[in-house]
């Protein structure tokens, strides 16, 4: 750790960097930390930045502002919710903290730089930075710097945005240009979130070209910028020196290197050109994430230093024009790293949303508005006809005063009619080619994407889901359609098995007949469709019974299935009372199989009902509840463990079988982890799921609310109460505190 960290505190760092200071280096000090999870941590980081500025106030007091020490500020360390969905809090709470740091820097004649982090935070950072630059309290201060990552595809547009900012407010912005240190995370995040492309360049040569392009733009605009080029690549540094000399800007920039790295190169240059050392400061407890990034960055084969000492790589290869390398790599880039939508062989990865993109979020909010007050009329769909009858009001679980629509449940006669039609259509549907059935599922996937804004609205209004949960569920529904289409094709051809001489044995798969699909309310779109499309593509006709609490969502999905090409006599939509459905449908000998997601107790009832019949054995596919546990030992990074615990516990308001129920923690870390969890819970917002900033919505209904409140009362008597999340939502909703 001592190799890469200047000291455990700012005073030790000043002592340890004294020899480099005497060589002529300037310094930028970074308070190590990977981002606050709690308000307490944020305040501690704020104090560390203020203390560091105070410790530096008397160093090089007579030198110009940009030659004095600098503090690098990690915005995520100053606020536990530094993300665009929490932008209102960012622009008030986080802004007040970074302004406090900037005011002290201005008082002492020092500079600060806002460190670059993950790409999903960029829009939020730019908005915050613009507010800082335009603040009248900094009218005459030129010491608020910005860090730009060259691997970001938005690097050039960001520079142009900053030029406009500098022009408007008469600023000269110190701008540190780096390659970028979160590449692996950016790639994985883009794949998991289903982005249309990667926010960063995927080839090192492309990042190298971007770095040079950004360098050129910065050097051509030194009236607005003081460029600070952070590189250990000798070829890149040489190109910058040459370009600066051509432009007559030899004294208009500086280089930067990391503490513990690049000394042999920059020690040769320091007499001619200014160089600043980026110097991490902090305890070894906070070192690991930073150290891993450095090791990953410098351990790869494409690293300049590694290539320089590799006897198998000729020097002329290192000196090759990076533009030529980039052009050569254009064709191979996508082959080596597929786009997020193409990472799965045989099917596409569903598209998601970049929730940190300001334009995307504004567009989504505007489009959602058209569905906010829509009233839905739904009912059973038998042989393609929507049946009317006595209907139930469907009210939103977050506000019982809001009417979502009405649903007419199927009665005894409706269920018998649906069963008859499904039975009559089963043989013809089974004879349809697998390819034609699979194509219908892929059509359905496309139709869901086209209707996703309405589904987001419905999932919020009828199921009480937050924005993150709705997007995840819609993507899961799309993935189900594409996945089962792929699997059906893979299993469509008979498979020849080993056999005796003169004998041929084949294994082939066929539809069984009529399937009953019984889905839950906690995933009213994804699981409903997952059950139904799997049964359909396998050649079965289907009776689909959704949960009564979320039947409108299933109704809209069923309408899309017909539009996608499912014959109206093959799929019957029958929202019904559970007991009645069991008596009429599940006890009937026509039923060949049941797909069920719900409680273990109900699964046992279904199993017994099927077993009592005097008919061929029906298949029961049951997905039931359980106790999900997590074990955390002392090897875990507690901040990361806290993130996982919060997500597992509270996504979908904890209403999923995979939600964390029991946490086992090693004694030695239990107190520290408990404090982190308490602090992270205090930052969660329990409110109206229509608000993008909401983290937890309501539970589904009054019964669920009562059950949870009763359990909380019981546990408060039997166990030690640690923390709960405060409600900010409507008093007429089913919220749990």
Predicted segments with their positions:
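Positively charged, amphipathic and often flexible ligand-engagement surfaces
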Residues: 1-351
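Residue-level signal for inorganic ion chemistry
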Residues: 401, 422, 437, 459, ...
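Terminal low-complexity tails and localization/encapsulation signals of metabolic enzymes
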Residues: 281-282, 286-289, 293-420, 424, ...
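ALDH superfamily catalytic-core signature
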Residues: 563-565, 587-589, 593, 600-737
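Catalytic cores of nucleotide-enabled group-transfer and carboxylate-activating enzymes in metabolic
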Residues: 3-11, 15, 21-27, 37, ...
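Structural signal for hydrophobic packing residues in well-ordered secondary-structure cores
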Residues: 21, 53, 57-60, 133-136, ...
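Generic beta-strand/beta-sheet core signal
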Residues: 30-32, 74-76, 113-117, 147-149, ...
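Rossmann-like NAD(P) dinucleotide-binding subdomain of oxidoreductase/dehydrogenase enzymes
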Residues: 460, 488-640
């Amino acid at each position: 750790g001592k190799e890469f960290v200047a000291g455990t505190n700012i005073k030790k760092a000043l002592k340890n960097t004294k020899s480099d200071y005497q060589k002529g280096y300037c310094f930028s000090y970074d308070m190590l930390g990977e981002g606050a999870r709690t308000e307490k941590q944020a305040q501690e980081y704020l104090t560390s930045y203020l203390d560091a500025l105070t410790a530096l106030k008397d160093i090089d007091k007579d030198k110009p502002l940009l030659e004095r020490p600098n503090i690098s500020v990690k915005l995520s360390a100053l606020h536990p919710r530094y993300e665009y969905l929490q932008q209102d809090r960012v622009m008030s709470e986080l802004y007040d903290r970074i302004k406090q740091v900037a005011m002290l820097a201005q008082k002492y004649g020092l500079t600060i730089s806002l460190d670059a982090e993950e790409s999903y935070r960029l829009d939020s950072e730019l908005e915050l930075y613009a507010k800082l630059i335009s603040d009248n309290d900094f009218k005459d201060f030129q010491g608020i710097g910005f860090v730009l990552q060259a691997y970001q595809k938005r690097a050039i547009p960001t520079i142009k945005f900053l030029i406009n900012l500098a022009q408007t407010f008469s600023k000269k912005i110190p701008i540190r240009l780096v390659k970028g240190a979160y590449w692996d995370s950016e790639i994985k995040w883009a794949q998991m979130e289903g982005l249309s492309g990667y926010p960063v360049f995927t080839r090192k040569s492309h990042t190298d070209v971007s770095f040079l392009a950004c360098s050129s733009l910065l050097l051509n605009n030194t009236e607005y910028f003081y460029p600070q080029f952070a590189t250990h690549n000798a070829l890149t540094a040489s190109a910058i020196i040459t370009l600066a000399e051509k432009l007559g800007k030899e004294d208009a920039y500086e280089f930067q290197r990391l503490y513990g790295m690049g000394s042999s190169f920059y020690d040769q240059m320091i007499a001619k050109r200014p160089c600043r050392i980026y110097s991490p400061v902090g305890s070894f407890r906070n070192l690991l994430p930073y150290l891993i990034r450095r090791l990953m960055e410098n351990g790869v084969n494409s690293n300049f230093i590694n290539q320089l000492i590799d006897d198998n790589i000729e020097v002329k290869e290192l000196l090759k024009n990076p533009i030529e390398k980039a052009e050569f790599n254009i064709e191979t880039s996508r082959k080596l790293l597929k786009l997020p939508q193409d990472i799965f062989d045989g099917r596409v990865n569903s598209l998601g949303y970049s929730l940190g993109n300001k334009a995307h979020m504004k567009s989504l909010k505007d489009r959602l508005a058209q569905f906010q007050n829509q009233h839905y009329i739904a009912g059973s769909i038998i042989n393609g006809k929507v049946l009317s009858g006595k209907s139930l009001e469907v009210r939103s679980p977050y506000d019982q005063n809001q009417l979502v629509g009405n649903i007419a449940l199927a009665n005894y006669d409706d269920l018998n009619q649906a069963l008859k039609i499904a039975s009559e259509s089963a043989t013809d549907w089974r004879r349809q080619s697998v390819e034609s059935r699979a194509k219908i599922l892929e059509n359905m996937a496309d139709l869901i994407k086209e209707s996703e804004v309405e589904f987001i609205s419905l999932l919020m209004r009828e199921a009480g889901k937050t924005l993150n949960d709705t997007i995840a569920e819609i993507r899961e529904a799309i993935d189900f359609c594409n996945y089962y289409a792929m699997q059906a094709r893979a299993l469509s051809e008979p498979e020849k098995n080993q056999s005796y001489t003169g004998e041929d044995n084949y294994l082939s798969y066929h539809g069984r007949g009529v399937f009953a699909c019984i889905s839950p309310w906690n995933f009213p779109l994804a699981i409903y469709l997952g059950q139904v499309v799997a049964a359909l593509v396998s050649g079965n006709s289907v009776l689909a019974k959704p949960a009564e609490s979320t039947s409108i969502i299933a109704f809209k999905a069923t309408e899309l299935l017909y539009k996608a090409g499912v014959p109206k006599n093959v799929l019957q939509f029958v929202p019904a009372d559970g007991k009645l459905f069991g008596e009429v449908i599940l006890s009937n000998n026509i039923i060949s199989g049941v797909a069920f997601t719900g409680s273990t107790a109900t699964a046992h009832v279904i199993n017994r009902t099927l077993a009592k019949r005097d008919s061929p054995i029906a298949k029961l596919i049951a997905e039931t509840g359980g106790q999900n546990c997590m074990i955390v030992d002392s090897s875990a990074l507690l901040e990361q463990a806290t993130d996982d615990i919060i997500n597992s516990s509270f996504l979908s308001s904890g209403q999923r079988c995979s939600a964390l129920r029991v946490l086992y923690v090693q004694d030695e870390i239990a107190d520290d982890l408990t404090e982190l969890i308490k602090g992270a819970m205090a930052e969660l917002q329990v409110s109206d799921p229509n608000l993008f900033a909401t983290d937890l919505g309501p539970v589904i209904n009054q019964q669920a609310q009562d059950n949870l409140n009763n359990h909380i009362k019981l546990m408060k008597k039997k166990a030690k109460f640690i923390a709960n999340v405060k409600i900010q939502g409507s008093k007429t909703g089913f919220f749990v505190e």
